[in-house]
Amino acid sequence: MAGAAALQQGAQREAVAPISAALHAHPENARLWQLAGLIHRDLEDLASSVQAFEQASKLWPEDAMIAHGHACVRFEAGLPASQRFNLAMRLAPANRSILLQHAAALIGEGQQAAAVDEINRELVRNPGWIQGHVALAKLRWAAGDHQHFIDSFEGGLLAAPRDPALWRAYVDVFLRGEQYERALPIIERARAAVGAHLAFDVAEATSRSELGEMEAASRLFEALANVQDPAFTEHRLRFLLRAGRLEELAAAGEESVARDSFGRAWPYLSIAWRLLGDRRWEWLEGDPSLVGVYDLSAELPPLDALADRLRAIHLAANQPLDQSVRGGTQTEGHLFQRIEPEIRMLRKAVVEAVERHVAQLPPARAGHPLLIARRSPIGFAGSWSVRLTGGGRHIDHVHPEGWLSSALYIALPASSERNAPDAGWLTLGQAAHLGVDLPPIRTIEPKPGRLVLFPSTMWHGTRPFDAGERLTVAFDVKRPAQAS
């Protein structure tokens, strides 16, 4: 089938016409409707995807894959989906990932306690279920429980004390929450229970580096010198930066990007080059056209209505476990997939602005992570909203999964609530939380309706403010596939 072949090759747009023709000829074929739903989902057209899956479900209500797909697209579109996930669980009872999706749907419908209870019940039945422990830890952290958020792991380890994967996940959750001091005794317990393991050595090296224990961290990283793993490479680069070993940092970063020109080393290499006075940083980030500032006020829905829509989906009480938010909340899921009119209008305005920005970028530069040859189509690796309140901010961070990243301001504190002239401003090119004494490359004042676009490899954060609300939309533009 031409449509299925196109889908397998990643050519979803080319698949729409043949699938539509096939549906016209065979409107009672549930699999065709399912395939149409998957294609529209990949194209981020969730309204059409939901319609296609609804038709597939009517034609074949007891098919497990159709039921699961239908539940997923309803959830992603921002529609009630818990009942659909209930059906999917009944049809595929062994698939515990559906249970986690059902829990997420319950949270989206305001039933956080029910979601926690559901995961807890399954963990009682299956105490070694790692994904369940991780999900529960994230839920408890976002609910504000930063002390006991990991308690379910202890219950799991009572049942499976020598499960190395469970110990690794336990340690990793502490690292995600930047609870490095608490991670160290868990690492020692893990070694005592299951023996030496590379993951425990990496976790200890990372924790001691982040805690500023540079002598111990240095010994550990030297013992791990032959490890070739992208995540480990980033930990090592952070250590070298914190330790002030700039020549080693530059050499390691250059070696890493030579292996993978879209890898995670660029943000650290930029800082190293700037601190060393190496003007290659200008090739990487110095061109002013890489950053764009756009006023979308006329293209967006009324900002008050958009702000109300966004506030309604900020359901957590606290910052997420493994994100840059401090003193605020972040929405779950892919914001731009939702089908509310305000969100669809928002997405359209953003796509047009990104297209304008990409069109004015300089020509391709060999090896450059942003200035690549093929720059379309525009798609999104993720999209979300952040709501910061008094004292809230983003610590300096980067987005390794993106090509272009962003900040779109929807609501801001009144000027009378700002403690300093630059309170809440966006900073680009600064990594102060890593002990780096470098000024930002650029600072940008937030204004309602203002969109800022910048390379995903560029460090960015925000200055804190004392009071009021800062409501933003953020997204990562997906890096277009390049010709092989």
What role is predicted for each listed range?
Residues 21-22, 55-56, 87-89, 121-122, ...:
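Canonical positions in the second alpha-helix
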Residues 341-351, 355-453, 458-464, 468-484:
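Catalytic core of non-heme Fe(II) oxygenases with the double-stranded beta-helix
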Residues 27, 61, 93, 127, ...:
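Short coil turns that delineate tetratricopeptide repeat
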Residues 1, 35, 69-70, 101, ...:
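Canonical tetratricopeptide repeat
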Residues 281-372:
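Non-heme Fe(II)/2-oxoglutarate
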